[in-house]
Swiss-Prot record:
Name used for this protein in its record: CBL-interacting serine/threonine-protein kinase 20
Record: active site: 134
Catalytic activity field: L-seryl-[protein] + ATP = O-phospho-L-seryl-[protein] + ADP + H(+); L-threonyl-[protein] + ATP = O-phospho-L-threonyl-[protein] + ADP + H(+)
Region Activation loop, annotated ranges: 152-181
Amino acid sequence: MDKNGIVLMRKYELGRLLGQGTFAKVYHARNIKTGESVAIKVIDKQKVAKVGLIDQIKREISVMRLVRHPHVVFLHEVMASKTKIYFAMEYVKGGELFDKVSKGKLKENIARKYFQQLIGAIDYCHSRGVYHRDLKPENLLLDENGDLKISDFGLSALRESKQQDGLLHTTCGTPAYVAPEVIGKKGYDGAKADVWSCGVVLYVLLAGFLPFHEQNLVEMYRKITKGEFKCPNWFPPEVKKLLSRILDPNPNSRIKIEKIMENSWFQKGFKKIETPKSPESHQIDSLISDVHAAFSVKPMSYNAFDLISSLSQGFDLSGLFEKEERSESKFTTKKDAKEIVSKFEEIATSSERFNLTKSDVGVKMEDKREGRKGHLAIDVEIFEVTNSFHMVEFKKSGGDTMEYKQFCDRELRPSLKDIVWKWQGNNNNSNNEKIEVIH
């Protein structure tokens, strides 16, 4: 549908579509009062809820308000309706850095400038307890002045996401840019993992291609974990030396960001940016109680985020998702769709109780026997998040609720344990872990 002419929240006139993904569309828009151009990210609540991405959206909001830096895309405000969430963000006109690199390698001074801006911004993020975890040229935008802006904080982690060992434990990021310790699925330091990704970005800017690139993913992972890469002969000696320290597969001996910033090659023409002073913690705390109420009282037009200039730890954004389903019947799995369907077929056959039919979105199980309120029927929907990561939701579509709950508790859920990665919802996850999706 053409959005031109639509006025959002009596404030923004939507223009052309800039891009879209599975769960969101981004439009160019104009602030009616000021005439300022912005980018409006429109997120479908139902779609993100169905695949368990609510926490990821909340995290993106939290991080974008927590981080204020000239080289990070600025979030003006967040608005919500019953079905959509709207991010009004800084409009970055120059497009993706990826588009620039796809045309070939950059000149050394240009590559250094982007790397300086990237490292400066990431250093600031780390000082705020934020780790990006998906740094790549596609997530680095350029403004009209040719300056870099970091975007897409959907996978980022806040300091409180660390477990008792002080490390992060969720595999995130794009394979070719991800650090070896992240691939190893052991605990990792988010700051050190970001440094590795920055090194891959620097290599790509100067070479025009990736340091680790194989058609075979296993072979690529092997090279990453061993730190096996070669620099082209046009790389300056000081860059080769710097990259050897950044792309060190041992995170403990890998160069730290402050040492990168002291490097002589990095220092050429580098101007450190003074960042705005963050509000005092007591100023934030005094406003937190008002924010959730603002969304529940007047979600259509009240901009809750004008109340605060930064978010504190533990802030609850559940008001954005007024009808979030706290279902006991969702789980994530690393099995493919065929294996998931096969498991439900096995359950139906072994119980000798259900007929099973396949549909475009999953399967339907129907009890051969008639219960208190007719035949018990269960719809199973399978949602692909990535090729190797699925969300499965099953729910009663007919019959008695008590019979459904008894069947789920005694037969269905125990039978699914060998394909379930994580159950969704507070009642199903004893560790109360957040589910983060691998891209």
